[in-house]
Each structure stands twice: as C-alpha cells, then as structure tokens.
Amino acid sequence: MAIEKKFVQEGFKKAMVDEYFLEKLERAGYGGMEINRTPMGTQITLKAEKPGMIIGKAGKSIRRYTKEMDMRFKMDNPQIDVQEVKKPELNAQMMATRLANALERGWYFRKAGQSTLQRIMDSGAMGCEVIIAGKLTGARKRREKFIAGYIKHCGKPVEELVDVGYARAKKKLGIIGVKVRIMPPEAVLPDQITIEAAQAAAPAPAEKKSPAAGAEPAKEAAAVPAPAESTAAEVEKIIAESEAAEAVTPEGAEGDEKAAAAKKQPKKKVVKTDGDSQS
C-alpha cells in the first residue's frame, strides 16, 4: 500500500469515528476527540460536558463503545478515556451543536448567531467566527458570517490553535450547516511580541572605608555648632547706629578740624622790653 493511500485511509477512519460519536453522544454534550497510537494500543480521548452519561452505570456504556471501535472500525486494542469540559463556551463543537439545536427550535438565524458569538467572546476567547449556510429566509440558499475579535484563517497556527466545530440543523426547507471557529484565550501566535518592563537595578552596597589620620579634626570641626543668626531686633539696632553716624553735619566737622589745627601750631612767646615797661 502506498504511503499516500495509507494517510488517506487513516484520515477517513478518524472522520468516521468522529461522526459516530457525534451521533451517539449528542445528549452527553460531545465536544470532540483525540486518537493517539501507543505501544499498548489505540488511545481515544473523548471530551464531553456530561462524562457520566458516556461511562454509564458501572461502566456499561463505555465498554459497549470500546467493543464497537474494535469490531466496526478494526482498531488495535482501543482504550477510551473521557474528560470533562470545564468551559463549554470555548469548545467549538459544543457551541456548533447548541447553535444547530437553537435553529431547529425556531430561533431566527441572525439572533442565534449573534447570541452564540457573544457568549463565546464573553468567556474570554481571543476571536470567534460563526458561519450559517443554507436556506435561511427564502428559496435561495445563502451564507451569513459573524466575526468578533482576532482569528487566524491560514497557515500552521490554524491547525494548532484554532478549534473548529461542525453541526447540521434539520428544518422544513432543508439542511442548514453550522460552522464555529474559536481562537482560545491562551493561544500564543508566532508573530506575537511581548515587551517586558525594565526592572530597576538594586543599589550597590556602600563600601566601608577605614578612618584616615585627618578624619578626627574634621569630625570635631563638624561637631562645633554654627553661630546663630542675628535676630531681627539686632539687625534693626545696627542699621539705626549706622544711620546716626552718617547724620553728622558738615559745619561741626569743619570746627573740629580747625581746633585740631590750632593745637598743632606752636605758641608765640611775648618778650617785654624796657621801653614797654616805662611807658
């Protein structure tokens, strides 16, 4: 068998198993599956809103499904594990099934689509896309698309990050197809850049210096208290004294100068003659 044909058969078998569980476990809130091959056999992990309905009483239902995988799909030692979905609003298959049921109950397609989209975004999804196709209101088929947030449409991130779910709503006019694509909140895109805030550097510890020879006089000088500043009264007193010294008149200054000059001049001696004495 060619390798290409083997891959095609494996993909076809996986699609058939998924459709089988979707039909059998609709009431249990089926949310998809994963198939992994191990040395012990084939591990099948089912996601459901109500795991108890899949396991059944004393494990009766899950044993029946395991036997069906072995006989109908020829799987090697199948082992089924069931996981509970904590947030059904972030599971694309569950939301697609709920939307299809709402359309079958008579909800208007635009109201049902917007309501489903809002519930998914309120649960914290990064982005969501809801597509409803078929005979919605008239005789001709058409497609309505509802988009919110950010979602990838091509490339490898679509295969790894985007969750896709399909469902069908049976109405009188025909089948209406529903497709839901969800980008989970924890998805990390390859082109996403995160800038971290710079952390403040811790201050370096101060070095302990040995006391120098001239350090003690400096400490003593620093210990001497600085002279207190003059109070306002002392300042006013000094200003008044300086103004009084400047108020001396120039005449008084000249008299003082003449008195000082007279003291410096030598005194004249008067000699009396005989003529003066006789007269």
From Swiss-Prot:
Q: What is this protein called?
A: Small ribosomal subunit protein uS3
| HAMAP family for this protein | Ribosomal_uS3_A
State whether it acts alone or in a complex, and with which partners, per the record: Part of the 30S ribosomal subunit.
Q: Where is the composition biased (Low complexity)?
A: 206-233, 241-252
Where does it sit, as one GO cellular component term?
Answer: cytosolic small ribosomal subunit
Annotated region Disordered: the residues are 206-279
Gene Ontology terms describing biological process: translation
One family name in Pfam for this protein = KH_2
Q: Which SMART domains match?
A: KH
As for family, the record states: Belongs to the universal ribosomal protein uS3 family.
What is the species listed in this Swiss-Prot or TrEMBL entry?
A: Methanocella arvoryzae (strain DSM 22066 / NBRC 105507 / MRE50)
UniProtKB keywords: Ribonucleoprotein, Ribosomal protein, RNA-binding, rRNA-binding
Q: Which domain of life is it from?
A: Archaea
| Described purpose of this protein according to its UniProt entry | Binds the lower part of the 30S subunit head.
One MF annotation (Gene Ontology) recorded for this entry: rRNA binding
Q: Which residues form the KH type-2 domain?
A: 17-86
- Which InterPro entries does this chain map to? KH_dom, KH_dom-like_a/b, KH_dom_type_2, KH_sf_prok-type, Ribosomal_S3_C_sf, Ribosomal_uS3_arc, Ribosomal_uS3_C, Ribosomal_uS3_euk/arc
